[in-house]
């Protein structure tokens, strides 16, 4: 945002130097990226009058000019411009002047035998135009208002500075000169003098204007006003042209310049349509009800003010007249209905659009304009009608217009919305002020609080707890909470004036038991050879049940994911294609579902492929794949540090997993996830290149079980001082029996001396039968106070074998 100091001085008293003001603005939050001295290119250039012009004897193209610059002696200047002639007023660079635009210092010099004592300049040489044809001849009326020898900076209003401000998204008020002036007033504690509305106009609530609910939400507004009696051929006065051009906008004509002036002054974009051109477009007289705002349709197009033709689509919002697009809403107007030098009547549009729709439109057409940048940051609709009124007041000054009616889509409620501001909260957050170089401290007084907030336009009502604060419309986008007001108080008083000791000493933070458990989980996986991955949570819309996001950047990232396993399968496939023989990955992330409401669930997901134990010995002709039980053991080992029991329950209800090699994971009797081998159909469809094991566990269930006191608080267990006895038993079981049921029976039977039981081998063979499988278990026996003998465990061991044979219809194998 560029703004000139002279313009600001019309609105606010400025006592600081430009450099000091730049520093104050930057510290206050409006960073000044550059400060430009407008007179730097014209120092030493003055108003002169050409008295005579003689041809140079040594050149056909050069002339010898006598020029009066108001001194006792006329200057003799050699000039090569074709348009030089006597009795014209010109810009004269005197000896010693430096023309920065062309990197030239003026010196007395002899040109083909004739002395030259200066230079008659073009606007290009003064840095005021990109190119010039000959010298600049000054308008006589302008020249006669000044004495000869007057510095050019006075003639062209160049005794000025231009501030280039970097306005952040949270301060949209900085996109207007009035907003910047108010900020300066608050920083310097100086008086404001804003332009008053000389004449107000009738406002008509027009329900006939059709509006797209996405583009014009409840916080938005759309106004359209017919104004007759204007003249598109009229040029802007010098003051207006000077202000907008110093702000970086090229002057076109008075009508267009006035809309741009309101954009800069008020921060409210306006657009003027040529009424006659609109009538020609739709084939009838135009009325306010003919205007509408809607989504563009496929195959529609619009030639815009930049002369380019844009193909439209449903991501673009357009303003239409009788359903024919005449502008890309909030971005750029159409060329066919634009103001020209023949314009005599206009329709003036003033609106506030939904920032999201403007951002989509701007991105879709690849244009970012002064209007769109303001809409994207957010504009208060409470200012729109007053900004339109201000524009009409200016039109009345320069044209004999009719008394227009402002047609509006809705009448904004201008009642103040109050924010509760507590005195105690201010003191608690900010702490005391430092007085007398840290020798004294005191809290901020009520007077200081009221004064600072009043400076930024707030009105305050005293209450027992503090104040109820009403915020002006152009700050309503960023001042919405109590803490925002406290921040403003601190900013305006100066952060450096507060005590360095924080009012609320920060206590050293510590991790919760859930956070510690989550770290244990991650460490457990990485210690067992897993790599943590982070996959993208946004996916394309490939099914209706996905939750759409409101402002997607791409169609490929338009929805929230409802699973993680698909991305993990892709990661495994990429590793396989890259020649990797194993891939163990895990991820803790969110998935999203919708039923009657949106559900966000945190899950631990992962994939296991290959066998890392062989590492580089991949050509040893050994099977490099894990079977189901080995893969399940990897997961068990990774989670062993949590000291919780996870049971397996066979299931065939998960469609992307093998129906005979999948289990639900049960934690504390609750269904907490799954573990299983990828379904063979996914391998046939090439969605999975190898046998992969997938798992998913609900993090809430996992942490809930692992952080209970009986699991979380370590219990001392004396280290065994006597040896254990191990015995292996082998049975052939029907495949219908679960290993967990078998081990539970063993533990229950041998609970007095049995320390642990492990499954150490699985064997399948056609000789055993298709529905049978051999399991080998290792049983560990140990007493607390003595070394066990065979005779001590014989009875219990026999009972275990007997119970297994009875319960599972099997026999002990030799």
Swiss-Prot record:
Q: Give a Pfam family name.
A: tRNA_synthFbeta
Q: Which GO terms describe its biological process?
A: phenylalanyl-tRNA aminoacylation
Keywords linked to the UniProt accession: Aminoacyl-tRNA synthetase, ATP-binding, Cytoplasm, Ligase, Magnesium, Metal-binding, Nucleotide-binding, Protein biosynthesis, RNA-binding, tRNA-binding
Q: Where is the tRNA-binding domain?
A: 39-153
Question: Which prosthetic group or cofactor does it need?
Answer: Mg(2+)
Record carries keyword Cell membrane:
no
Q: Which residues form the B5 domain?
A: 414-500
Reactions performed catalytically:
tRNA(Phe) + L-phenylalanine + ATP = L-phenylalanyl-tRNA(Phe) + AMP + diphosphate + H(+)
What family does the entry list?
Answer: Belongs to the phenylalanyl-tRNA synthetase beta subunit family. Type 1 subfamily.
* Name of this protein: Phenylalanine--tRNA ligase beta subunit
Report which gene this protein is encoded by: pheT
